[in-house]
Amino acid sequence: MKTHNDILAALAALPLFLTGAAFAAEPGMLDTLRNNIVQTWEQPQHYDLYLPAITWHARFAYSQEKIDSYNERPWGAGFGQSRWDEKGNWHGLYLMAFKDSFNKWEPIGGYGWEATWRPLEGSDFHWGAGYTVGVTMRDNWRYIPIPVILPMASVGYGPLTLQMTYIPGTYDNGNVYFAWLRLQF
């Protein structure tokens, strides 16, 4: 019988299987992902408030008419839980909903990981780079669950962090910068 932790880990790892990345992964990589997800779920150190900040469509990839029609102020909110590991890296589980490019609600949930650096000794300033693995749903895709694996970067001070990702794409599709504030408490 599956526990809810196994189900949670399977849902978060679903995008890896659907994109074929799981088949290229070295042995143990998915176990590490699963263990990190379960540990973050069972042993959170913090709870997080997510506030979407900006959606920016790459100007080289869209006509001005399209850009003018898109929403680039994705108001919404989210909640999550997170922890810092023994290396100082960040792990988080999150659910967020925001207004997408078409001003329709887009929920997203998943797991994020960032290697984190503190370049100024004794300072609360930090920056990071990593990835997020999750599932989103969009109005223009009839709210069918869509797996995502995206790069992530951040810069922060103390409990406030600006996290961001870039959704790659083609002309008139994708090529979107998305950023949100994460307040850790």
UniProtKB/Swiss-Prot annotation:
InterPro entries cross-referenced by the UniProt entry: LipidA_acyl_PagP, OMP/PagP_b-brl
Domain of life: Bacteria
Cystines in this chain: none
Keywords, alphabetical: Acyltransferase, Cell outer membrane, Membrane, Signal, Transferase
A single GO cellular-component term on record: cell outer membrane
EC number, as in UniProt: 2.3.1.251
Biological processes annotated in GO: lipid A biosynthetic process
Segment forming the signal sequence: 1-24
Catalytic activity field: a lipid A + a 1,2-diacyl-sn-glycero-3-phosphocholine = a hepta-acyl lipid A + a 2-acyl-sn-glycero-3-phosphocholine; a lipid IVA + a 1,2-diacyl-sn-glycero-3-phosphocholine = a lipid IVB + a 2-acyl-sn-glycero-3-phosphocholine; a lipid IIA + a 1,2-diacyl-sn-glycero-3-phosphocholine = a lipid IIB + a 2-acyl-sn-glycero-3-phosphocholine
A molecular-function term among this protein's GO annotations: acyltransferase activity
Subcellular location: Cell outer membrane
Pfam families linked to this entry: PagP
Site feature (Role in the phospholipid gating) residues: Y171
Active site residues of this protein: H57, D100, S101
Membrane-spanning intervals of the chain: none
Major subcellular site: membrane
Site (Role in lipopolysaccharide recognition): K66
Family classification: Belongs to the lipid A palmitoyltransferase family.
NCBIfam families with a match to the protein in the record: PRK11045.1 (NF008271)
Record text on subunit structure and interactions: Homodimer.
Function: Transfers a fatty acid residue from the sn-1 position of a phospholipid to the N-linked hydroxyfatty acid chain on the proximal unit of lipid A or its precursors.
Name used for this protein in its record: Lipid A acyltransferase PagP
